[in-house]
Amino acid sequence: MLTHLDSQGRANMVDVTEKAVTSREATAEAVVRMRPETLQLIQDGGHPKGDVFAVARIAGIQAAKRTHELIPLCHPLLLTSVKLELQAEAPDAVRIRARCRLAGQTGVEMEALTAASVAALTIYDMCKAVDRGMVIEQVQLLEKLGGKSGHYRKEEEGQA
Protein backbone atom coordinates (compact mmCIF):
# COMPACT_ATOMS: atom_id res chain seq x y z
CA MET A 1 0.00 0.00 0.00
CA LEU A 2 1.26 3.44 -0.91
CA THR A 3 1.06 5.58 2.22
CA HIS A 4 0.67 8.87 0.35
CA LEU A 5 -2.67 7.86 -1.22
CA ASP A 6 -6.06 8.08 0.47
CA SER A 7 -8.90 5.57 0.00
CA GLN A 8 -9.91 7.24 -3.30
CA GLY A 9 -6.34 7.19 -4.64
CA ARG A 10 -5.70 10.90 -4.10
CA ALA A 11 -2.27 12.10 -3.03
CA ASN A 12 -2.06 13.37 0.55
CA MET A 13 0.62 14.10 3.10
CA VAL A 14 0.85 11.23 5.59
CA ASP A 15 -0.48 12.15 9.06
CA VAL A 16 2.31 11.40 11.53
CA THR A 17 0.64 13.06 14.53
CA GLU A 18 0.28 9.84 16.52
CA LYS A 19 3.66 8.36 15.60
CA ALA A 20 6.26 8.14 18.34
CA VAL A 21 9.32 10.37 18.23
CA THR A 22 12.32 8.11 17.64
CA SER A 23 15.90 8.49 16.52
CA ARG A 24 16.15 8.20 12.75
CA GLU A 25 19.07 8.19 10.36
CA ALA A 26 19.59 7.66 6.64
CA THR A 27 22.66 7.49 4.41
CA ALA A 28 22.53 7.95 0.64
CA GLU A 29 25.11 8.30 -2.09
CA ALA A 30 25.64 9.57 -5.60
CA VAL A 31 28.58 9.21 -7.97
CA VAL A 32 29.72 11.77 -10.53
CA ARG A 33 31.78 10.33 -13.41
CA MET A 34 34.03 12.72 -15.30
CA ARG A 35 37.14 12.88 -17.40
CA PRO A 36 40.32 12.11 -15.43
CA GLU A 37 41.59 15.62 -16.22
CA THR A 38 38.52 17.13 -14.56
CA LEU A 39 39.01 15.09 -11.42
CA GLN A 40 42.68 16.09 -11.34
CA LEU A 41 41.72 19.76 -11.65
CA ILE A 42 39.40 19.41 -8.63
CA GLN A 43 42.00 17.55 -6.59
CA ASP A 44 44.73 20.08 -7.40
CA GLY A 45 42.50 22.95 -6.25
CA GLY A 46 42.96 24.57 -9.65
CA HIS A 47 39.32 24.99 -10.59
CA PRO A 48 38.59 28.62 -11.56
CA LYS A 49 35.31 28.59 -9.60
CA GLY A 50 37.02 27.64 -6.33
CA ASP A 51 36.86 24.66 -3.97
CA VAL A 52 34.42 22.32 -5.71
CA PHE A 53 34.10 19.93 -2.77
CA ALA A 54 33.43 22.72 -0.25
CA VAL A 55 30.70 24.27 -2.39
CA ALA A 56 29.10 20.87 -3.11
CA ARG A 57 29.13 20.02 0.61
CA ILE A 58 27.35 23.26 1.52
CA ALA A 59 24.85 22.79 -1.33
CA GLY A 60 24.05 19.28 -0.09
CA ILE A 61 23.49 20.48 3.46
CA GLN A 62 21.22 23.29 2.27
CA ALA A 63 19.29 20.88 0.05
CA ALA A 64 18.65 18.45 2.91
CA LYS A 65 17.22 21.29 4.98
CA ARG A 66 14.88 22.31 2.15
CA THR A 67 13.75 18.90 0.89
CA HIS A 68 10.13 19.56 1.88
CA GLU A 69 10.11 22.54 -0.52
CA LEU A 70 11.22 20.35 -3.43
CA ILE A 71 9.26 17.13 -2.91
CA PRO A 72 5.56 17.92 -2.51
CA LEU A 73 4.45 15.45 0.19
CA CYS A 74 7.58 15.52 2.39
CA HIS A 75 7.21 16.84 5.91
CA PRO A 76 9.38 19.77 7.01
CA LEU A 77 11.86 18.21 9.43
CA LEU A 78 14.04 19.50 12.25
CA LEU A 79 17.25 17.82 11.17
CA THR A 80 19.80 17.52 13.94
CA SER A 81 22.72 16.51 11.71
CA VAL A 82 23.58 16.58 8.02
CA LYS A 83 27.02 15.36 6.99
CA LEU A 84 28.43 15.00 3.50
CA GLU A 85 31.61 13.20 2.57
CA LEU A 86 33.05 13.72 -0.90
CA GLN A 87 35.79 11.41 -2.05
CA ALA A 88 37.77 11.44 -5.27
CA GLU A 89 37.97 7.96 -6.77
CA ALA A 90 40.72 7.77 -9.36
CA PRO A 91 40.75 7.87 -12.22
CA ASP A 92 37.40 9.47 -13.01
CA ALA A 93 34.80 9.77 -10.24
CA VAL A 94 33.65 11.56 -7.12
CA ARG A 95 31.60 9.57 -4.60
CA ILE A 96 29.25 11.59 -2.40
CA ARG A 97 27.81 10.17 0.82
CA ALA A 98 25.15 12.09 2.72
CA ARG A 99 23.95 11.18 6.21
CA CYS A 100 20.97 12.85 7.88
CA ARG A 101 19.79 12.39 11.46
CA LEU A 102 16.97 13.56 13.67
CA ALA A 103 14.68 12.65 16.52
CA GLY A 104 11.27 12.74 14.89
CA GLN A 105 8.11 11.07 13.67
CA THR A 106 9.13 10.37 10.09
CA GLY A 107 12.23 9.17 8.28
CA VAL A 108 15.03 11.15 6.65
CA GLU A 109 15.63 9.05 3.52
CA MET A 110 14.45 11.77 1.15
CA GLU A 111 16.66 14.35 2.86
CA ALA A 112 19.74 12.15 2.49
CA LEU A 113 18.92 11.37 -1.15
CA THR A 114 18.30 15.05 -1.88
CA ALA A 115 21.57 16.07 -0.22
CA ALA A 116 23.59 13.58 -2.27
CA SER A 117 21.78 14.52 -5.49
CA VAL A 118 22.19 18.27 -5.10
CA ALA A 119 25.85 17.91 -4.15
CA ALA A 120 26.31 15.91 -7.38
CA LEU A 121 24.42 18.53 -9.39
CA THR A 122 26.61 21.23 -7.87
CA ILE A 123 29.76 19.41 -8.97
CA TYR A 124 28.27 19.16 -12.46
CA ASP A 125 27.38 22.86 -12.46
CA MET A 126 30.82 23.95 -11.29
CA CYS A 127 32.68 21.70 -13.76
CA LYS A 128 30.46 21.80 -16.85
CA ALA A 129 32.62 24.46 -18.53
CA VAL A 130 35.53 22.00 -18.62
CA ASP A 131 33.60 18.71 -18.93
CA ARG A 132 30.07 18.57 -20.34
CA GLY A 133 30.21 14.78 -20.56
CA MET A 134 29.95 14.17 -16.81
CA VAL A 135 27.40 11.58 -15.68
CA ILE A 136 25.58 11.46 -12.35
CA GLU A 137 24.84 7.87 -11.40
CA GLN A 138 24.10 5.47 -8.57
CA VAL A 139 21.87 7.82 -6.59
CA GLN A 140 20.68 5.40 -3.93
CA LEU A 141 19.75 4.83 -0.32
CA LEU A 142 22.48 2.87 1.44
CA GLU A 143 21.07 2.60 4.94
CA LYS A 144 18.09 3.62 7.03
CA LEU A 145 17.72 3.30 10.80
CA GLY A 146 14.75 3.89 13.07
CA GLY A 147 11.01 4.06 12.74
CA LYS A 148 8.38 1.38 12.36
CA SER A 149 10.00 -0.28 9.35
CA GLY A 150 13.26 -0.75 11.24
CA HIS A 151 16.75 -1.12 9.80
CA TYR A 152 17.49 -1.31 6.09
CA ARG A 153 20.96 -1.77 4.61
CA LYS A 154 21.40 -2.04 0.85
CA GLU A 155 23.76 -5.03 1.08
CA GLU A 156 21.13 -7.01 3.00
CA GLU A 157 18.85 -6.77 -0.03
CA GLY A 158 21.44 -8.40 -2.27
CA GLN A 159 21.76 -5.28 -4.40
CA ALA A 160 25.37 -4.39 -3.60
Swiss-Prot record:
Pathway note: Cofactor biosynthesis; molybdopterin biosynthesis
Alphabetized Pfam families for the sequence: MoaC
Record's catalysed reaction(s): (8S)-3',8-cyclo-7,8-dihydroguanosine 5'-triphosphate = cyclic pyranopterin phosphate + diphosphate
GO biological process: Mo-molybdopterin cofactor biosynthetic process
The enzyme's E.C. designation: 4.6.1.17
Active site: D125
UniProt keyword annotations, A-Z: Lyase, Molybdenum cofactor biosynthesis
Class in the EC hierarchy, top level: lyase
Gene3D superfamilies attached to this UniProt entry: Molybdopterin cofactor biosynthesis C (MoaC) domain
Molecular function terms, GO-annotated: cyclic pyranopterin monophosphate synthase activity
Residues that hold substrate according to the record: L73, C74, H75, M110, E111
PANTHER family for this protein: CYCLIC PYRANOPTERIN MONOPHOSPHATE SYNTHASE, MOLYBDOPTERIN COFACTOR SYNTHESIS PROTEIN A
Subunit annotation: Homohexamer; trimer of dimers.
Function: Catalyzes the conversion of (8S)-3',8-cyclo-7,8-dihydroguanosine 5'-triphosphate to cyclic pyranopterin monophosphate (cPMP).
Family: Belongs to the MoaC family.
HAMAP family recorded: MoaC_B
Protein name, UniProt field: Cyclic pyranopterin monophosphate synthase
Gene: moaC
